């Protein structure tokens, strides 16, 4: 049966995902940055209270995936912490300035991760040649690749996702970006073994007093009075589609 991974940005989101049938969680912070490494407090509390597999993201900042030596050293320290806390896997990705997988750094990541399953995240979608990148990641021992098929969303990139799947059994190709209940069946019919979804909604902040003339963000247009939350009904609906597909 296809596996459903849900992207979560808090303990509350992780609990909702687990209760509604998620098979695995990608744990992140900073949704507006596309996901950054969670704090120690979030990592420890999720590790203590969530029973399904959780894979934290290792990403020190937003933007591109070419990191300074200092940033990369911090990534290795975060991997050490995630391993010490007992997580079964992690999510990360590093590129060269030319858009290739940085194999030298990936070797260091794989050594630091040890027995943990490593997912190469959507840095893959920024690679110059996805098919060469997949071969290199297979050689590195990466467990899976999260990809939208190098398009804005996975529905647009499905043909490339299918080509990547046809390239071999490993790494597992996990489709993500815009995967929802209304298009999930297309991915299952295409033979996608794992899907990744945020299943999220933005909820208004409970703050009654709001200083509308001030922002804590460099983006003055940012909405600081909304909060991301995993929608349990959306997770349950997707899990139901997967179960029914398996029963066919």
Swiss-Prot record:
Native organism: Salmonella paratyphi A (strain AKU_12601)
InterPro entries: CutC-like (IPR005627), CutC-like_dom_sf (IPR036822)
Subunit field text: Homodimer.
Record keywords: Cytoplasm
Sequence similarity: Belongs to the CutC family.
Compartmental location: Cytoplasm
Organism taxonomic ancestry: Bacteria, Pseudomonadati, Pseudomonadota, Gammaproteobacteria, Enterobacterales
Pfam families: CutC (PF03932)
Gene Ontology terms for molecular function: copper ion binding
SUPFAM superfamilies: CutC-like (SSF110395)
Name the record gives this protein: PF03932 family protein CutC
Main location: cytoplasm
UniProt cross-references to PANTHER family, sorted A to Z: COPPER HOMEOSTASIS PROTEIN CUTC (PTHR12598), COPPER HOMEOSTASIS PROTEIN CUTC HOMOLOG (PTHR12598:SF0)
Gene Ontology cellular-component annotations: cytoplasm
